[in-house]
Amino acid sequence: MWLQILSLVLSVGRIDAAPPGQSRIVGGYKCEKNSQPWQVAVINEYLCGGVLIDPSWVITAAHCYSNNYQVLLGRNNLFKDEPFAQRRLVRQSFRHPDYIPLIVTNDTEQPVHDHSNDLMLLHLSEPADITGGVKVIDLPTKEPKVGSTCLASGWGSTNPSEMVVSHDLQCVNIHLLSNEKCIETYKDNVTDVMLCAGEMEGGKDTCAGDSGGPLICDGVLQGITSGGATPCAKPKTPAIYAKLIKFTSWIKKVMKENP
């Protein structure tokens, strides 16, 4: 029954396939089965990604916040029953205390999405079962290096201009860029708690519905997908990711205080 409900929530073409301020995978490929066992789908009014960092904890983007969530683990295809598939509800969510959903700029006086501190922890209702298709991934212990080869993944749109959910988990290989490259596009909205990643020639990018998913650079989880330009994958418009090394103390504190 819940797969039928999920099918309704994620109906092809629905605008709510991604939340406001979302990041959106284009130019990628179908991930090898069970190659991203820490990847989860976070289902509320929208579709987001997430990362299993502990059997009881998922990290995702703060702008994926909702009053109710379902977390799908061990899935390659969102719409098919699979042997490693698990489902968990969320006991409690913890947005980063310094996250501000919208800001007003002096130039336009229009609210825009602020990607600073765009992280949220989800405490699962019961621990995930660790299997061949469901595994945790460690938090980073070292700064990522500019120029690193990175992999982003998600079930977000594969079309730069349309919000159409991908049935199969998609992967895309991109590079970690200097923050200056994102500053050229997003101006003062880029800070040292963010990572900039993509391809300057365009054609490869995260897209609608990928928010909250992992950015893995040289085999290490370094970022969480936050946001980017619309349409996705345009030249000279890399995407922004939350820089996890800046938040490990907060993550560990929340997990310790909420056993």
Swiss-Prot record:
Pfam families: Trypsin (PF00089)
Signal peptide: 1-18
PROSITE patterns, per database record: TRYPSIN_DOM, TRYPSIN_HIS, TRYPSIN_SER
Gene Ontology biological-process entries: regulation of systemic arterial blood pressure; zymogen activation
A GO term, aspect molecular function: serine-type peptidase activity
Pro-piece positions: 19-24
UniProtKB keywords: Disulfide bond, Glycoprotein, Hydrolase, Metal-binding, Protease, Serine protease, Signal, Zinc, Zymogen
Gene3D superfamilies, per database record: Trypsin-like serine proteases
Keyword Magnesium: no
SMART domains: Tryp_SPc
GO cellular component: extracellular space; secretory granule
EC class: hydrolase
UniProt tissue specificity: Found in submaxillary gland.
Source taxon at top rank: Eukaryota
Domain Peptidase S1: 25-256
Active site: H63 (charge relay system), D118 (charge relay system), S211 (charge relay system)
Catalysed conversion reaction: Preferential cleavage of Arg-|-Xaa bonds in small molecule substrates. Highly selective action to release kallidin (lysyl-bradykinin) from kininogen involves hydrolysis of Met-|-Xaa or Leu-|-Xaa
Cofactor binding, per record: Binds 1 zinc ion per subunit.
Positions of glycan attachment: N106, N189
Cofactor needs: Zn(2+)
EC number: 3.4.21.35
Tagged with keyword Hydrolase: yes
Protein family per UniProt: Belongs to the peptidase S1 family. Kallikrein subfamily.
Function as written in the Swiss-Prot or TrEMBL entry: This protein has both trypsin- and chymotrypsin-like activities, being able to release angiotensin II from angiotensin I or angiotensinogen.
Name of this chain's protein: Tonin
